[in-house]
Amino acid sequence: MKRTFQPSNRKRKNKHGFRSRMETANGRRVLAARRAKGRKRLTVSDEIPRKG
């Protein structure tokens, strides 16, 4: 049986990245809550190294 977690950075970024959080009101609420709490990384976009 295939495991349920099949990691992919693209899917991870599309679902939980900064841009996708900013798209919805609730996503912006998540960001605000994480800022208020003083999180070092707001979204997974801050963890995944970018090209360039």
UniProtKB/Swiss-Prot annotation:
InterPro entries, per database record: Ribosomal_bL34, Ribosomal_bL34_CS
Cellular component terms per the entry's GO annotation: ribonucleoprotein complex; ribosome
Ranges of compositional bias, category Basic and acidic residues: 43-52
Keyword Ribonucleoprotein applies: yes
Top-level taxon: Bacteria
Chain spans, region Disordered: 1-52
GO molecular function (one): structural constituent of ribosome
Key words, A-Z: Ribonucleoprotein, Ribosomal protein
Family: Belongs to the bacterial ribosomal protein bL34 family.
Identification of the protein by name: Large ribosomal subunit protein bL34
Gene name per UniProt: rpmH
